[in-house]
């Protein structure tokens, strides 16, 4: 699981290196050039200390912020409504979207797009399992027009992509879907959605649902053997025993010999699972926000595929938001979808304007 986190850090750093030093980022990042296209920037969890200077910079230099529809219209036609326009996006709908970003955007007369995960959002104003906005807060932000609510998948869940078991459900495990390391699946449905996962449940090597890799489905007999073995030996207490996980791996191996093998989902199952997720997230947001037309989708972890893009178009989306680099295999003319590449928010300070920061200083700014 630590290895998965290191992989994500390495992937992020690699993309940033390629973007800057191989000049794959927009020219304004690594030179004094004006932006050729409308720049898009991505935020996640924010603090007032980090966000306020960025919004001040945009406002003082007369930048106009756009909704997702406005961005795609401008980008696809090449006709800008103003000389200086940018797209600000917030992923995951952290609680700070409402408590920090929303009031600051109002103060500076700016707006942003929020890609939310409707299957994770609570209905009440009390805190949920994770520090996310709730539906009353999202309705308020949407109603004012300051925040344009769009889709970030139904559950932001990951899937097992191999038979390799990297861990077991145990005390102290980080269950946050934002962490992404926890990816057990029972047939088509992620067990993460149930709210309860028994100790001993095998955790496989994981990947993003919208990538090319199909989900691996472990034999349920093997899963239940591991769960029952832990439960019969004290549950939580089992993992305090020396060599507990090593013993459980031996149980897993033996059970696999005595049960039919697990399998990967086939192409039809993969396609259906992806399409259902696209449709479900769109419908749920539109149900919660009457009158809202959800047309824009952001890939969790910035990880998608040509199949996913094609299916998102089939589900009614017109754009896909990624990270800073999108595969060269993604072409608007082929996919019929607009691909939005987004830079880390600190690169706002590289936009032309009074108080523009040097690249070396921006690279050390971790907003």
Describe the residue ranges of each PLM region:
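Short, flexible/disordered intra-domain loops and linkers
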Residues: 123-131, 163
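Histidine-centered divalent metal-coordination motifs
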Residues: 44, 152, 156
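Acidic (Asp/Glu)-rich catalytic clusters
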Residues: 55, 59-60, 79, 102-109, ...
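Short, catalytically relevant binding-site loops at active-site mouths
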Residues: 119-121, 155-158, 303-304
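A short alpha/beta connector and helix-capping loop motif
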Residues: 98-119
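Short active-site segment of divalent metal-dependent hydrolases/proteases
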Residues: 94-95, 155
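C-terminal active-site subregion of NodB/CE4 polysaccharide deacetylases
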Residues: 1-89, 95-96, 161-163, 171-367
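Structural detector of well-ordered beta-strand residues that form the stable sheet scaffold
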Residues: 66, 113-115, 150, 321-322
